[in-house]
A protein has these predicted regions:
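Alpha-helical recognition/docking segments in bacterial nutrient-uptake
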Residues: 2-111, 115, 175-178, 182
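Short, well-ordered beta-strand segments
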Residues: 6-9, 131, 208
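Short, solvent-exposed amphipathic alpha-helices that sit
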Residues: 16-30, 112-119, 139-158, 189, ...
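Short beta-strand elements in bilobed, periplasmic/extracellular small-molecule ligand-binding domains
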Residues: 28-40, 129-134, 149-169, 174-177
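Short, polar loop motifs at secondary-structure junctions
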Residues: 90-96, 162-166, 210-215
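Hydrophobic alpha-helical segments within soluble ligand-binding/sensing domains
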Residues: 92-131, 186, 211, 226-246
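An alpha-beta-alpha
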Residues: 111-153, 249-261
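Flexible loop/turn connectors
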Residues: 172-175, 181-261
Length: 261
């Protein structure tokens, strides 16, 4: 009963990818020999890794996060089509243009944020304003921003987008949705600006962060997040390999209520 050889091709390593990996690794329970490469959202690296490793692994598990321009996306589809469907599992992003019976466990960047915020709608309707801090370098910032705008407009919640936190935007009673990578500078700047005004998260103003992470429970006495369930995503991908049955499933996305909102 030999170990299955699995190539994990992640875009980058972060606290969320660590959760994904741990869940995948723990579920396989030693039945998979896992190799990890990072493509860094560079299409030429994806092409190179597939070239070098075709036929060497039983399964290829890939997070296809690449620039959304048509030229790059065409190359992504072409590269992924080289892997036999029965050996391919796509993670974290869904590619509707990619045909075939491969496996996929993913989040829906266009709609998930809307449903995540809807889980806190009663509270959000009472706040004077939702301030949304977007990360322009994120591949999906336009999709996520659209979902947030739609949510706010349908529920008549005043909102404004910012690309960074400045002390001037930090005000009592308002809520800040940080769409950045986990625990990066914007969250730190927000906490600092609040501290200098003696404002306490959860008591005087609210913070919601995008993407759950192991640190979320601890930071600011508990950070409220809207996030896909990365543990579920890793587990489902591993189960496909263990059972030898591939399927496509959107993972759960929810608001996890903690102290900060």
């Amino acid at each position: 009963n030999r170990q299955m050889r699995v190539l994990l091709l992640f875009d980058k390593f972060s606290s969320t990818k660590q959760m994904l990996y741990n869940s995948f690794h723990d579920t396989t329970g030693g039945k998979a020999d896992i190799t990890i490469y990072l493509h860094n959202q560079q299409i030429n690296l994806l092409e190179y890794y597939i070239d070098e490793n075709l036929g060497k692994f039983d399964y290829y598990v890939i997070t296809p996060h690449f620039p959304l321009d048509p030229e790059t996306q065409k190359r992504v589809l072409k590269a992924l089509r080289r892997i036999p469907n029965r050996k391919l599992i796509i993670m974290d992003n869904y590619l509707p243009e990619l045909p075939g019976n491969y496996g996929a466990v993913y989040q829906d960047f266009e709609n998930d944020a809307y449903y995540g915020l809807a889980m806190g709608v009663k509270k959000l309707k009472k706040v004077p304003k939702l301030n949304v801090v977007i990360e322009l370098s994120s591949l999906y910032h336009t999709m996520i921003s659209k979902a947030v705008s739609r949510f706010c407009e349908e529920n008549e919640i005043p909102y404004e987008f910012y690309t960074q936190v400045t002390p001037q935007i930090v005000k009592p009673k308002e809520v800040y949705l940080i769409l950045h990578g986990q625990f990066d500078m914007e969250l730190i700047k927000l906490a600092r600006a609040a501290k200098s005004q003696k404002l306490k998260p959860g008591r005087d103003f609210g913070i919601i962060s995008y993407n759950e992470s192991p640190m979320s429970e601890i930071v600011l006495d508990g950070l409220t997040t809207i996030s896909v369930d990365f543990v579920q995503m890793g587990r489902l991908a591993a189960e496909m390999i263990l059972d030898g049955k591939l399927f496509k499933q959107k993972c759960d996305f929810r608001m996890i209520h903690r102290n900060s909102f």
